[in-house]
């Protein structure tokens, strides 16, 4: 029962803090600052809320494999199973353009704030043209010096589940030569999708070796990324502390 109370308190604080940071972002957009300079705001948002999750809910984290992050712009493919990685993406990798469904940028205050960072907002109902949108906009972001964050499963998956990875991130890599960095974690076991409860424990984030798309097809890049991510998640979960007791 106590963990439920803590989870409710954290959720209320999450909404309040997110609204506050949304206003700060909108005000910062009025200043002559680049996206990279303003990125300190969402980074601070992610760091603060993950710290708050540790304090209020007892949900901490570790990050492994940071030496695998390339020095040039890259595409990170993330396992998607929780809200938590939406916070963590802000500080685990360098400033990057977020790939998301366009409905997000319509949300008052928060969505408007997201829009000021020029995300890759995709109309998912557009089918194949949505992939083209992603590749075209992703190419522009990479050329500007920013990385690209992609959740190839397209939606949050329940613990232990996955689906065929979407091709857009891998296609972007093959067309631009940008390396793909797979990122695995077990956040969904502690902070499940569609659940208010945040369980105490430690989330492990593991950054995998970059995948060089040279000479590979988008399907091959995708397969390598998915195999590594899903195998690493299974490995994390199988170890002591990998999931709640």
Residue positions per predicted region:
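Non-catalytic C-terminal accessory region of glycerolipid acyltransferases
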Residues: 4, 131-245
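Membrane-interfacial terminal anchoring regions of lipid-handling membrane enzymes
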Residues: 1-31, 40, 67, 220-245
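Transmembrane alpha-helices and immediately adjacent membrane-cytoplasm interface residues
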Residues: 51-61
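Generic preference for hydrophobic
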Residues: 63, 76, 98-99, 205-207
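Catalytic core of membrane glycerolipid acyltransferases/transacylases, capturing the structured
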Residues: 25-47, 55-56, 70-127
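Short acidic-hydrophobic, aromatic-tinged amphipathic segments that line or gate anion-handling sites
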Residues: 63, 120-123, 213
């Amino acid at each position: 029962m106590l963990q439920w109370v803590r989870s409710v308190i954290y959720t209320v604080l999450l909404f309040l803090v997110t609204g506050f940071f949304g206003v700060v972002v909108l005000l910062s957009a009025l200043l002559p600052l680049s996206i990279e300079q303003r990125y300190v705001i969402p980074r601070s948002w992610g760091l603060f809320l993950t710290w708050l999750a540790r304090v209020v809910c007892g949900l901490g984290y570790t990050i492994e494999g940071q030496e695998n992050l390339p020095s040039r712009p890259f595409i990170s493919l993330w396992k998607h199973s929780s809200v938590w990685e939406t916070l963590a993406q802000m500080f685990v990798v360098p400033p990057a353009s977020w790939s998301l469904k366009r409905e997000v940028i319509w949300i008052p205050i928060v969505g408007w704030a997201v829009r000021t960072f020029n995300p890759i907002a995709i109309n998912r109902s557009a089918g194949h043209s949505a992939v083209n949108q992603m590749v075209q906009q992703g190419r522009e972001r990479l050329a500007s010096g920013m990385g690209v964050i992609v959740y190839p499963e397209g939606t949050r998956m329940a613990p232990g589940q996955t689906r065929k990875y979407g091709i857009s991130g891998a296609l972007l890599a093959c067309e631009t030569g940008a390396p793909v960095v797979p990122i695995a974690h077990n956040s969904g076991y502690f902070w499940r999708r569609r659940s208010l409860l945040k369980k105490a424990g430690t989330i492990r984030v593991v950054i995998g070796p970059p995948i060089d798309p040279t000479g590979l097809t988008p399907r091959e890049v995708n397969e390598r990324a998915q195999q590594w991510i899903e195998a690493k998640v299974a490995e994390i979960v199988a170890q002591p502390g990998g999931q709640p007791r």
